[in-house]
């Protein structure tokens, strides 16, 4: 059995009120087109053809070499859009899935079941349908007394009886490939919209006494087509619920799943605890036994097993096992933390590698640095890495002790086991096993305070 796919992605999406093509709006971190294409791959199409139009280069860039593309210059209806794919699929034997690129909730399992139903029933066309509590706006499935599909009627063309029908057309179909393009040559624009309706091929097949069937979705949510921001928000809500439920089934605990945002490509190992208001985005991986507390935000990062992240932001970073971060820490892109590193409150790390068991407990900036293992970085330490034009590196050896309020002016190297005195400004190399003091000597002038305006004696 050879399968093909046509994805309709040419529309502008006027009701989205956006410069972005409709299919490129995102749901849980992926464009709607990407969601649809991932589901389409479940039927293993020998060729996928995407019909593009509005801002076509942006749409093409999303799928790149995963799909062939055809251009629909004028949007003259769904039938016209499918006609554009004939140059890619003409004369081929097999079954062709036609699906809209704005249906992000459709699953690969449903599409595979649709194809199997189509093949097993030897249909020339199979419509993916759903039962709607409120069918207004959808095309209706009209059956005869024997339950056979006889036609699909659009909302604007439906009579009073047809408008009461609850079974709706989802806009997804499977056709015999050759018969599809033969039938498309017979459709017209004689309808309320003045467009080429793809649905008209059903009546053509019926007139030729060819078999047309309908496969009913079990979950109506999968049929959602996104035409405006309201529907986009609905799709986001449904997708978010799916994602959290998947992770819960796989052993992840959510204290308040309704408040958590997790994107589609995030991976979470079993026995992770996630509190409320946590955001996980991009290609993030969370290791087993990790705890993510309220307010944590992580994007494109790897968190090692058994770590604790407390109300902190982590971007494009790699953390080994047993790391503790936060509260209120910020790990910026290019940060690597080895095992059992502690990054405390109000610490920012950027573009740096920090060795195992090193601690930076509070109020510190570490940028463009290589920090060894078992280093203590005192409160208020700053690596001065930028001179207004260039960035420079700071290197700190193993077991070094950086005193509180140290200012390390890069480029700089602090050797193994070295110690910087609190309040020091260091601009030259510190050899291993050395103590460096880079501050002014304290001068005490007894009784001088009485001469100053703030002294109580001055107010008398």
Swiss-Prot record:
InterPro entries: Bifunctional_GlmU, GlmU-like, GlmU_C_LbH, Hexapep, NTP_transferase_dom, Nucleotide-diphossugar_trans, Trimer_LpxA-like_sf. Residues 1-229 are annotated as: Pyrophosphorylase. Pathway: Nucleotide-sugar biosynthesis; UDP-N-acetyl-alpha-D-glucosamine biosynthesis; N-acetyl-alpha-D-glucosamine 1-phosphate from alpha-D-glucosamine 6-phosphate (route II): step 2/2; Nucleotide-sugar biosynthesis; UDP-N-acetyl-alpha-D-glucosamine biosynthesis; UDP-N-acetyl-alpha-D-glucosamine from N-acetyl-alpha-D-glucosamine 1-phosphate: step 1/1; Bacterial outer membrane biogenesis; LPS lipid A biosynthesis. Gene3D superfamilies: Hexapeptide repeat proteins (2.160.10.10), Spore Coat Polysaccharide Biosynthesis Protein SpsA, Chain A (3.90.550.10). Disulfide bonds: none annotated. Its cofactor is Mg(2+). It catalyses: alpha-D-glucosamine 1-phosphate + acetyl-CoA = N-acetyl-alpha-D-glucosamine 1-phosphate + CoA + H(+); N-acetyl-alpha-D-glucosamine 1-phosphate + UTP + H(+) = UDP-N-acetyl-alpha-D-glucosamine + diphosphate. Mg(2+) binds at residues 102, 227. GO terms for biological process: cell morphogenesis; cell wall organization; lipid A biosynthetic process; peptidoglycan biosynthetic process; regulation of cell shape; UDP-N-acetylglucosamine biosynthetic process. Residues 230-250 are annotated as: Linker. Its EC number is 2.7.7.23, 2.3.1.157. It is found in: Cytoplasm. Residues 251-460 are annotated as: N-acetyltransferase. Binds 1 Mg(2+) ion per subunit. The active site is at residue 362. Acetyl-CoA binds at residues 379, 385-386, 404, 422, 439. It comes from the Bacteria. In the N-terminal section; belongs to the N-acetylglucosamine-1-phosphate uridyltransferase family. Homotrimer. This is Bifunctional protein GlmU.
